[in-house]
């Protein structure tokens, strides 16, 4: 009877020991803030891609979080809280309106145009333990759509015209989201191969 509790304790300890998996990597991914060398539109595009990337990683089943630090800050700080870190190392966005048509009468008019947005990004994946670069990939996506781009009001003596920039912003957001979705797929494929 005295041996039964000891035997039970040994069985429970052995079961707990086998439950520890030191080989499989976790699903915790930190999304790093872009380096400070980016300004203006590049910084905004990089931040937008990072936001969408975190959302796409969460949809894919990862425990993704915003680190609120750059890679340089993380490398100086010895503590790491993720299995992998993702950084949007570079981003670029171009776009424009290659053509359109004006519709209206003598008082009111609307320009309807083709709006094109192209977004490219370099995404880097770092090991969470050593902070070494383990994978780098370049992505680019384009989105286009037809939308009203300006409104005009006029008469016989005066004519006023105002642009509607939101249509271009929407296309850039769609392209940034497409880049982030592709980046999440690439990260998931790399993790499965690891």
Show which residues each predicted segment covers:
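N-terminal compositionally biased, intrinsically disordered segments and leader/signal-like regions
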Residues: 16-17, 81
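Surface-exposed short loop/turn segments
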Residues: 78-136, 140, 144-147
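Short acidic, glycine/tyrosine-flanked loop/strand segments centered on an H-E-D-like triad
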Residues: 139-161
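A structural "domain/chain start" motif
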Residues: 18-71, 76-77, 161-194
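Sec-dependent N-terminal signal peptides
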Residues: 4-13
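Short, charged/polar low-complexity linear motifs in solvent-exposed/disordered segments
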Residues: 104, 150-154, 191-192
């Amino acid at each position: 009877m005295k041996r039964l509790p000891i035997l039970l304790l040994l069985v429970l300890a052995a079961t707990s020991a086998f439950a520890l998996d030191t080989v499989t990597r976790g699903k915790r991914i930190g999304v790093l803030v872009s380096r400070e060398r980016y300004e203006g539109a590049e910084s905004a595009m990089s931040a937008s891609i990072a936001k969408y990337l975190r959302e796409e990683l969460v949809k894919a089943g990862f425990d993704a979080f915003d680190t609120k630090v750059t890679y340089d800050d993380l490398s100086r700080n010895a503590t790491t809280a993720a299995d992998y870190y993702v950084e949007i190392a570079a981003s670029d966005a171009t776009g424009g309106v290659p053509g359109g048509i004006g519709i209206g009468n003598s008082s009111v008019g609307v320009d309807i145009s083709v709006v094109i947005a192209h977004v490219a990004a370099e995404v880097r994946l770092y090991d969470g333990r050593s902070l070494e670069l383990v994978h780098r990939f370049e992505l680019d996506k384009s989105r286009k759509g037809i939308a009203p781009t300006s409104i005009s009001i006029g008469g016989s003596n005066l004519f006023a015209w105002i642009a509607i920039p939101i249509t271009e912003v929407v296309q850039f957001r769609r392209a940034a989201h497409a880049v982030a979705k592709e980046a999440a797929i690439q990260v998931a494929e790399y993790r499965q191969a690891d």
